[in-house]
């Protein structure tokens, strides 16, 4: 774990387990963490409520929510309620319908803008190995390419002091993420990973299944969705 004492980090905070764990890791490393969430036209607001709850629980220095309506042109089952959400499991080599065109590129760009404005040293991302199997914008080669773009496209980058993209979970299994979240005291019960809204996770979408399997493996079935207990 790199030492980041006295550093400022911008943490993209979706409301899910992964981004919450990444933010907590940045805090443990000594960072002053600013949370950044996005209302991008997703099917429900439950994850934004979770992001606010996590920011409060982790006592983040600041938390901002930015509106970027990616639902205007659709292209994803996460922004278009007419499309069915996937429930058949993650398939190798297949980009699922929950991929939102350009989402991470938009989010990271805005995060870098905030980082440069605030003099932040890091941009913390919760992408991980599970996402690698599906989403093109959660892979190590994408992150490497974006770091190059960030260095070339900003004043601080050209001056050799641009913020570093930090994705500590990128090669972790979901079980390891859960175990680290438990160790760090991340409020898992306040996080939201389900593709659907409502008062309780559906337990059948791909995201719920991956999360529940990891919680079971980590010995915390009590935190699983009620459908899988």
UniProtKB/Swiss-Prot annotation:
GO terms for molecular function: ATP binding; ligase activity, forming carbon-nitrogen bonds; zinc ion binding. It catalyses: 7-carboxy-7-deazaguanine + NH4(+) + ATP = 7-cyano-7-deazaguanine + ADP + phosphate + H2O + H(+). Binds 1 zinc ion per subunit. Its EC number is 6.3.4.20. Gene3D superfamilies: HUPs (3.40.50.620). Keywords: ATP-binding, Ligase, Metal-binding, Nucleotide-binding, Queuosine biosynthesis, Zinc. Its cofactor is Zn(2+). Zn(2+) binds at residues 194, 202, 205, 208. Pathway: Purine metabolism; 7-cyano-7-deazaguanine biosynthesis. The keyword Lyase does not apply. It is an enzyme of class 6 (ligase). CDD domains: QueC-like. Pfam families: QueC. One of its GO terms (biological process) is queuosine biosynthetic process. ATP binds at residues 13-23. PANTHER family: 7-CYANO-7-DEAZAGUANINE SYNTHASE (PTHR42914:SF1). Belongs to the QueC family. NCBIfam families: 7-cyano-7-deazaguanine synthase QueC. Catalyzes the ATP-dependent conversion of 7-carboxy-7-deazaguanine (CDG) to 7-cyano-7-deazaguanine (preQ(0)). This is 7-cyano-7-deazaguanine synthase. The lineage of its organism: Bacteria, Bacillati, Cyanobacteriota, Cyanophyceae, Synechococcales. The gene is queC.
